[in-house]
Swiss-Prot record:
This is MYB31 transcription factor31. It comes from Zea mays. The keyword Ribonucleoprotein does not apply. Residues 9-61, 62-116 form the HTH myb-type domain. Coiled coil: none annotated.
Length: 273
């Protein structure tokens, strides 16, 4: 639900006010005061909107309005109020008796704004124009410095990555050259396969005590059976070992059977065994 219209638009006049309408409005306000602007047009016998009557009275018909140009004091006051209040023309008009907000706004845009620019003052910020440009230049310079520092940082990181890749490449080439020099200095026969050196076999140093195995016992028994024949053979001289008759110099311990040497028999028995 919005506000109801102040009057019926179908039965209201629009456009410029006539002299008769101005006289009726002034006479009614002098007699009855401003009152309610919604009911005032009907009471004054005007076919006008209440808003139109209010603006006509405030901006043109009220007796305390000042006519003529603005003075220098009014110009300075408008500039000071604008620096504090901004474009709130109704509040500025309340501090200037006899001046309307619409009149002050038009005067600002046509005269005071140009006057401030000619003095080198920004009409929006009320500061010198050179200072405003200097602050803009400083901000742009700071942004350029920040961008340059950021670019330098990126370049430094990129250079570090390039140096790391270069160092890795040199290390790989150095290892390849070292392996090639080792392969040339050590032949294939010395290193086995030509690439890896010979390794010592893994020795089991765990000691344990266990009875001898059966194969070792059999080997020891065979050695005991062979030892007597070897001893007899070792007790013969060269002539007796060949079966020759015993001489006076012979000192062999072998016995004779029927005047025959038993050396050959011993050898046969040894061979049979």
């Amino acid at each position: 639900m919005g506000r109801s219209p102040c009057c019926e638009k179908a039965h209201t006049n629009k456009g410029a006010w006539t002299k008769e309408e101005d006289e009726r409005l002034v006479a009614h306000i002098r007699a009855h005061g401003e009152g309610c602007w919604r009911s005032l047009p009907k009471a004054a016998g005007l076919l006008r909107c209440g808003k139109s009557c209010r603006l006509r009275w405030i901006n043109y018909l009220r007796p305390d309005l000042k006519r003529g140009n603005f003075t220098e004091e009014e110009d300075e006051l408008i500039v000071k109020l604008h620096s504090v209040l901004g474009n709130k023309w109704s509040l500025i008009a309340g501090r200037l008796p006899g001046r309307t907000d619409n009149e002050i706004k038009n005067y600002w845009n046509t005269h005071i704004r140009r006057k401030l620019l000619s003095r080198g003052i920004d009409p929006v910020t009320h500061r010198p124009v050179t200072e405003h440009h200097a602050s803009n230049i400083t901000i742009s310079f700071e942004t350029e410095v920040a961008a340059a520092a950021r670019d330098d940082k990126k370049g430094a990181v990129f250079r570090l990555e390039e140096e790391e890749e270069r160092n890795k490449a040199t290390m790989v080439v150095g290892r390849d050259r070292q392996s090639q020099s080792q392969s040339h200095s050590h032949p294939a026969g010395e290193w086995g396969q030509g690439k890896r050196p010979l390794k010592c076999p893994d020795l089991n140093l765990d000691l344990c005590i266990s009875p001898p195995c059966q194969e070792e016992e059999e080997m020891e028994e065979a050695a005991m059976r062979v030892r007597p024949a070897v001893k007899r053979e070792a007790g013969l001289c060269f002539g007796c070992s060949l079966g020759l008759p015993r001489t006076a110099d012979c000192k062999c311990s072998s016995s004779s059977f029927l005047g025959l040497r038993t050396a050959m028999l011993d050898f046969r028995s040894l061979e049979m065994k």
